[in-house]
Amino acid sequence: MKAKILIDAYEAFCPLDLSMEGDVKGLQMGSLDKDIRKVMITLDIRESTVAEAIKNEVDLIITKHAPIFKPLKDLVSSPQRDILLDLVKHDISVYVSHTNIDIVPGGLNDWFCDLLEIKEATYLSETKEGFGIGRIGTVKEQALEELASKVKRVFDLDTVRLIRYDKENPLISKIAICGGSGGEFYQDAVQKGADVYITGDIYYHTAQEMLTEGLFAVDPGHHIEVLFTEKLKEKLQGWKEENGWDVSIISSKASTNPFSHL
């Protein structure tokens, strides 16, 4: 089947025009007018995922994080450029779905809400009329540490960072969440009355500002977005069965998380 058939179905669910302004999105390498037999879904494109794609004879990669985010001045061989050159050598097309999958109803942030049992969720920060990034909703009243422990368990993490002073452990029930690096949206969480904000990559001074505003936070890191790979595989597999597509769909098993904790 042609790659375009699969991507057209995906974009009907998750349109590119939902993406935030300036985002890198859509086809980034190769062609959609090619026959594909195997598709791989990954969070990132790094040397490990490219090697995995080559080994599995993948024709199309769907990734959340674009391998090319800033304009390139050359494609001269180097450790970073070789990731791209290997994709070109093996004729592997690359399609990027970044903030549109964060924003779309039934997408990544809603998958997070399902896992954490966040109910009555609406968008956190409006990006265009009727749509927004992040989610805010409610959970049964519980202690902050209980929620943090659930986040660790659900996402199979060794640790999370708790943003609080003096080991405070208040009861909380209104939760904001944004996958990836969502510190810039913390004021939306404050304005909408969240008790706690779950997001990754929170800066030191941003954490202090949150606490001054009365907002606690749980930082599970950026890599919880790896949920994208399995959930999108499930969705594509369903479309494959409905439409009789002759294509194999796999999710990457290579870890691209650069962090570990001693």
Swiss-Prot record:
Q: Which UniProt keywords apply?
A: Metal-binding
In this chain, a divalent metal cation 2 is annotated as bound at 65, 222, 225
Xref: InterPro entries: DUF34/NIF3, DUF34/NIF3_sf
Q: Which family does it belong to?
A: Belongs to the GTP cyclohydrolase I type 2/NIF3 family.
Gene Ontology molecular functions = metal ion binding
Protein name stated in the entry? GTP cyclohydrolase 1 type 2 homolog
Q: Does the keyword Protein biosynthesis apply?
A: no
Subunit annotation: Homohexamer.
Whether Metal-binding counts among this entry's keywords is yes
Q: Which residues bind a divalent metal cation 1?
A: 102, 225
Any one of the GO CC terms: cytoplasm
